Regions:
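Conserved active-site and cofactor/substrate-binding residues in soluble primary-metabolism enzymes
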Residues: 38, 42, 50, 67, ...
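Carboxylate- and glycine-rich phosphate/diphosphate-binding segment that chelates Mg2+/Mn2+
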Residues: 170-240
């Protein structure tokens, strides 16, 4: 174990007792949820109704190749929205991946982001949206309540069941040099709205559907035995 890692671990253990009171004191926004077949298209319609005119779709190349992104792009175009697609997101997004997404959003002058994909795509979109407004690097955003200004408006369409990132305050980023994953945690990261569309999940490979289903179960068990539950945690865990 390196001395730097040991020091970080010691610091986290010192701060851990503060987590519960902080988590109870900070209000967590609840996104509007569109649920059911074609919920993703209803979400796209709502983006136009919110008045956003330049939307960046943040996703990965696999989903573009599978044809899952194009109907969403067309739904936005039909509302007269200027749409760009950034498909450079990779699993466990690293600082360079996030920087590339940030530069794409800046070049397009996006006024909103639509995240399409699994946890990595949604987490990346959260951090990119925060970077676009704050100008901070991913490393400067790591930790609790460091986003500062409200980020670019974010909408999320998960294509797997395993993440939950579409309703959470956190995003996980990877330092490619230290090979360390860290979390950006801030209520400002919660999307304005999210779509839970079973038709999109049906289009995913069977192995991905099975693996992310187990991931969802793991999250439910984790939250159920968590020592810092919120009022509705148990209800959602049992339902899952």
């Amino acid at each position: 174990m390196s001395s730097l890692f040991a020091l970080r671990l010691f610091g986290y253990r010192l701060l851990k007792p503060l987590g519960w009171p902080v988590s109870r004191a900070v209000a967590i926004p609840r996104p509007t949820l569109f649920v059911g077949p074609d919920a993703s298209l209803r979400l796209c319609a709502s983006i136009g109704q919110f008045g956003y005119r330049r939307v960046m779709i943040v996703t990965d190349a696999v989903l573009v190749k599978l044809g899952l992104v194009e109907p969403l792009r067309q739904a936005l175009l039909a509302q007269g929205i200027d749409v760009a697609v950034h498909d450079g997101i990779t699993p466990d997004p690293t600082y360079p991946v996030l920087q590339a997404g940030y530069e794409a959003v800046r070049a397009h002058r996006s006024d909103a982001i639509l995240a399409v994909g699994g946890g990595s795509a949604i987490d990346a979109a959260k951090v990119i949206g925060a970077m676009a407004v704050s100008g901070k690097s991913p490393a400067k955003l790591i930790g609790m309540l460091k986003v500062g200004k409200p980020m670019l408006p974010l909408f999320a369409i998960p294509t797997t069941a395993g993440t939950g990132s579409e309703v959470t305050v956190a995003a996980v980023v990877t330092d490619p040099v230290q090979h360390v994953k860290s979390a950006v945690i801030d209520p400002k990261l919660v999307p304005l709205a999210a779509a839970l569309d079973p038709l999109l999940m049906k289009g995913m490979p069977k192995a991905i559907t099975a693996a992310t289903g187990m991931d969802a179960l793991t999250h439910a068990v984790e939250a159920f035995i968590n020592r810092w539950p919120h009022a509705d945690t148990e209800q959602h865990c049992v339902a899952a």
